[in-house]
Curated annotation (Swiss-Prot):
Subunit structure comment from the entry: Monomer. Homodimer. May undergo minor heretodimerization with DIO1 and DIO2.
Enzyme Commission code(s) on record: 1.21.99.3
The name this protein goes by in its record: Thyroxine 5-deiodinase
Source organism (scientific name): Sparus aurata (Gilthead sea bream)
Family affiliation: Belongs to the iodothyronine deiodinase family.
Gene: dio3
C-alpha cells in the first residue's frame, strides 16, 4: 500500500513539475492566440511572418478571417504539442528513436531506421493532411526530394491530425478529416497524402503515437538522421517548419561529398 502511494505521489510531483516548466511558454502562446483573433493584429502578424520567409521553399502561412484561434480545442492542441516537444527523446547528436510505423502501400509494420540505406541521410517529414502549413509546403518538399534523391532518402511520416474536423478545425486545411479512431482511419488519411506526393515513401505512426511522441513532431516537423543519429532537428511547426533549412543542409552535405571525392582524386 505504502509503495503504491509513494509511486502515485512521485507521478503527481513529476506531473506538477512538468506543468510548472511548461506554463510560461504555454501562457505566452495562449496570449498570442487570443491576440490573433483580432483581425487587424492577425493581418499585421501574418504580413511580418511573410516578409521573413525564404522564398518559394517556405510560402507564408495563411489563416482565413473565419478561423478562430483562441478556443478550448486550440489551447489543448498547443499544450499537447509543447508537452510532446519537452518530453521527446529525439535530440540533435543523439541516437534517433527507432519507433514502429506502417508502410502505407504494403500495409506492413517496420521501424523508422529500417528505411535507412547504408550511410545515406534519411529525411523524416512529419505531418498530416489537415495541417495547412505542411500541405502548403509539400510541393517545395517534393522539389527537394527530386533534386537530392541521388544522395539522400526521404520518408513522410503521417501522424495524428493537426486540425481535425472534430477538434481545432481549420477552414484553410485542404481536407477535413476527423480524429483517427483506429489505424485504418490513419491509413485512409495517408492515402490522401500519397495522392498528393505520388511515388513518395509514406508511413503512418501507430495509434499509440509513439513516433510523434519520440520526435516531438506535432503539428509538423523535419528531421535528418545519418548513421542512426539525429544530425538535423527542425523547429516545431508551423513557425519552425522550414523547407529552406532542409535544402541548405542537403546542399552543404552534397558539397562535402564533392570535396571529399576531389581530395581522393588529388591523392
Amino acid at each position: 500500500m505504502h509503495d503504491s502511494g509513494g509511486v502515485q505521489m512521485a507521478r503527481a510531483l513529476k506531473h506538477a513539475a512538468l506543468c510548472l516548466m511548461l506554463l510560461p511558454r504555454f501562457l505566452l502562446a495562449a496570449v498570442m492566440l487570443w491576440l490573433l483573433d483580432f483581425l487587424c493584429i492577425r493581418k499585421k502578424v501574418l504580413l511580418k511572418m511573410g516578409e521573413r520567409q525564404d522564398g518559394p521553399d517556405d510560402p507564408p502561412v495563411c489563416v482565413s478571417d473565419s478561423n478562430k484561434m483562441f478556443t478550448l480545442e486550440s489551447l489543448r492542441a498547443v499544450w499537447y504539442g509543447q508537452k510532446l516537444d519537452f518530453l521527446k527523446s529525439a535530440h540533435l547528436g543523439r541516437t534517433a528513436p527507432n519507433t514502429e510505423v506502417m508502410l502505407v502501400q504494403e500495409r506492413r509494420q517496420v521501424r523508422i531506421l529500417d528505411c535507412m540505406k547504408g550511410k545515406r541521410p534519411l529525411i523524416l517529414n512529419f505531418g498530416s493532411c489537415s495541417u495547412p502549413p505542411f500541405m502548403t509546403r509539400l510541393a517545395a518538399f517534393q522539389r527537394v526530394v527530386s533534386q537530392y534523391a541521388d544522395i539522400a532518402d526521404f520518408l513522410v511520416v503521417y501522424i495524428e491530425e493537426a486540425h481535425p474536423s472534430d477538434g481545432w478545425v481549420s477552414s484553410d486545411a485542404p481536407y477535413q478529416i476527423p480524429k483517427h479512431r483506429c489505424l485504418e482511419d490513419r491509413l485512409r488519411a495517408a492515402q490522401l497524402m500519397l495522392a498528393e506526393v505520388p511515388g513518395s515513401n509514406v508511413v503512418v505512426d501507430n495509434m499509440d503515437n509513439s513516433s510523434n511522441a519520440a520526435y516531438g513532431a506535432y503539428f509538423e516537423r523535419l528531421y535528418i538522421v545519418r548513421d542512426e543519429r539525429v544530425v538535423y532537428q527542425g523547429g516545431r511547426g508551423p513557425e519552425g517548419y522550414r523547407i529552406s533549412e532542409l535544402r541548405n543542409w542537403l546542399e552543404q552535405y552534397r558539397n562535402g561529398l564533392v570535396n571529399s571525392q576531389t581530395a581522393v582524386l588529388h591523392v
